[in-house]
Regions:
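Structured aminoacyl-transfer and RNA-binding surfaces used for tRNA recognition/handling
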Residues: 1-211
Length: 211
């Protein structure tokens, strides 16, 4: 078994080897932002750069962000929820997109951590009246599983979900888009182990505009 420190070190090193620069964890209590009590996701302190600001460390970043999620408090004590945790994240600022993002994530889990590819599942956005199905991610997953000798089918290894499960956006609007989550089968239950968010839209009011 790996400790959380060993997993963090492997993650940072893996993405540094793929031309990412490590950035520090932002303060747990947000500076100049009253919208949340604590930073609750690795993406939170990077939103200005996802909106177009230039990051001093470049366009490929990796970090381990300290987080607290008050909405998870009732779940603390089971095998999947913690009071506080570190969220590992790799970030592409107008650099690579879906194909390389999903490839890197899967490669880290399978080749660096030794996860069994046969126990890995993916979810993708199924589309709705305001945003189309993420067919690109579906095709990427089918081809990646095929490289490992798996004939992945939608509805089996690749599951389609709605906005409640496979969409990221801020309540205040701004950049948003579909995501593709990765799950690992543990004792017959699928446990989320990773997520790639794709900022393809700008939400203005109730309208989603392609970026």
């Amino acid at each position: 078994h790996l400790s959380y420190k060993e997993i963090r070190e492997k993650y940072i090193k893996f993405f540094e080897q793929n031309n990412h620069k490590e950035i520090n964890s932002a303060p747990l209590v947000p500076e100049n932002d009253p919208s949340v009590l604590f930073v609750n996701a690795g993406m939170f302190p990077l939103v200005p750069f996802l909106q177009g600001e230039t990051h001093p460390n470049g366009t490929r970043l990796v970090n381990s962000q300290r987080c607290v999620r008050t909405i998870d408090i009732d779940g603390v004590g089971d095998a999947y929820h913690c009071t506080t945790f570190e969220m590992l994240g790799n970030w592409s600022l107008n650099d690579y997109f879906k194909k390389e993002a999903i490839e890197l994530t899967l490669k880290f889990f399978v080749e660096e951590l030794g996860f069994d590819i046969n126990r890995i599942y993916a979810t993708v956005f199924k589309g709705d009246d305001t945003s189309p199905k993420d067919t690109e991610s579906i095709d990427i997953w089918i081809n990646l599983f095929k490289e490992y000798g798996i004939d992945a089918k939608v509805g089996e290894k690749i599951l389609e979900k709605g906005k409640d499960d496979n969409w990221w956006e801020l309540a205040t609007g701004g950049p948003c888009g579909p995501d593709s989550e990765i799950f690992y089968e543990v004792d017959g239950q699928l446990v989320e182990i990773g997520n790639n968010v794709f900022m393809e839209y700008l939400k203005v009011g109730n309208e989603y505009r392609p970026l």
